[in-house]
């Protein structure tokens, strides 16, 4: 139920979590006009299923609305076999903040801090970090408590991520990823908790041994996605890797399956690896990233 964005927004709204204003039923043109009149342009068309920036269109004026909806539907159908789309008010300068949750079948729920995924291209994340440099401890605890409360109410089990837009000190729920995300390593780095291990234990019916008071965010971690793309057009670029040197050392982690002679396929996503750095401060973590990103 939380894997569908429309259903997830309804559920979170019912549990008291603030959501972005939107409209789900696009069959009634009068309701669409009323919604847009209320929130004003720009708005965004979103696919109800899937992710990765597919089935999304930003609309700034009325003349482009029908075209954007039709294009989003076609892309959503092709990508997720579900053409359902909905409209939301488009926030012009938000941060993309997400909260990591871990829940067992005994009603235990913990949050493991946040990730800031605001650096994106074509609605796809490129750089992720934890903790966010824009959140205060008060805001972090406030939204984390809301997430724990909502997950307990719906009886969620496993790992998951609640994604929010954050603007003017306010959080707006967008969607939930009911899986382990690409950017989970930065959370592992600052908490010292192996999310893959915990996910398996929970799936095996075991009780969480981690308590909320045990979770402390230490230091800073940044992840940079490594994509096989043309350097000018950013079009996915399959081919053979003829030279590869994997960076390493203190505060460096690389998640990848590539090697010298590896052939990048023409199918699937263009991401072939992730460079994750850790430091006692954000500045140290960033320095590690800049020093090692060209070595890959």
Which residues does each PLM region occupy?
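Conserved small/polar residues in nucleotide/adenosyl-binding loops
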Residues: 286-296
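Glycine-rich active-site loop/lid that clamps phosphate-bearing ligands
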Residues: 213-268
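Short amphipathic alpha-helices within nucleic acid-binding modules
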Residues: 68, 283, 289
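Active-site "cap" helix and flanking loop/linker of ATP-utilizing ligase/carboxylase catalytic domains
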Residues: 135-169, 177-231, 290
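Structural beta->alpha junctions
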Residues: 231, 278-282
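Mobile "lid/hinge" segments at catalytic clefts and subdomain interfaces of large enzymes
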Residues: 272-275
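Extended active-site and interfacial segments that coordinate phosphate-rich ligands
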Residues: 105-133, 178-205, 238-255
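N-terminal beta-alpha lobe that positions the nucleotide/phosphoryl donor
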Residues: 1-162, 166-181
């Amino acid at each position: 139920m939380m894997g569908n964005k429309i259903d997830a927004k309804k559920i979170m709204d019912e549990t008291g979590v603030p959501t972005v204003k939107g409209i789900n039923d696009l069959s009634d043109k009068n309701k669409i006009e009323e919604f847009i009149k209320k929130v004003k342009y720009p708005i965004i068309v979103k696919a109800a299923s899937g992710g990765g920036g597919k089935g999304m269109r930003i609309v700034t004026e009325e003349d482009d609305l029908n075209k954007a909806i039709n294009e989003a539907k076609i892309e959503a159908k092709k990508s997720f076999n579900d053409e359902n789309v909905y409209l939301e008010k488009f926030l012009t300068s938000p941060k993309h903040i997400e909260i990591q949750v871990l829940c067992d079948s005994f009603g235990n729920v913990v949050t493991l801090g946040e990730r800031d995924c605001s650096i994106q291209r074509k609605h796809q994340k490129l750089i992720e970090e934890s903790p966010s440099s824009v959140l205060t401890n008060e805001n972090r605890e406030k939204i984390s408590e809301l997430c724990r409360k909502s997950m307990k109410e719906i009886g969620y089990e496993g790992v998951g991520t609640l994604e929010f837009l954050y603007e003017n000190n306010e959080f707006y729920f967008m969607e939930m990823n009911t899986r382990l995300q690409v950017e989970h390593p930065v959370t592992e780095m600052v908490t010292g908790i192996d999310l893959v291990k915990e996910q398996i234990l929970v799936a095996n019916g075991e009780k969480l041994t981690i308590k909320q008071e045990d979770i402390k965010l230490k230091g800073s971690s940044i992840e940079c996605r490594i994509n096989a793309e043309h350097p000018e057009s950013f079009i996915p670029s399959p081919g053979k890797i003829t030279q590869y040197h994997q960076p390493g050392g203190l505060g460096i982690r690389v998640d990848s399956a590539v090697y010298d002679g590896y052939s990048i396929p023409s199918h699937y996503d263009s991401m072939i690896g992730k460079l994750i750095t850790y430091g006692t401060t954000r500045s140290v973590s960033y320095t590690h990233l800049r020093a090692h990103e060209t070595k890959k």
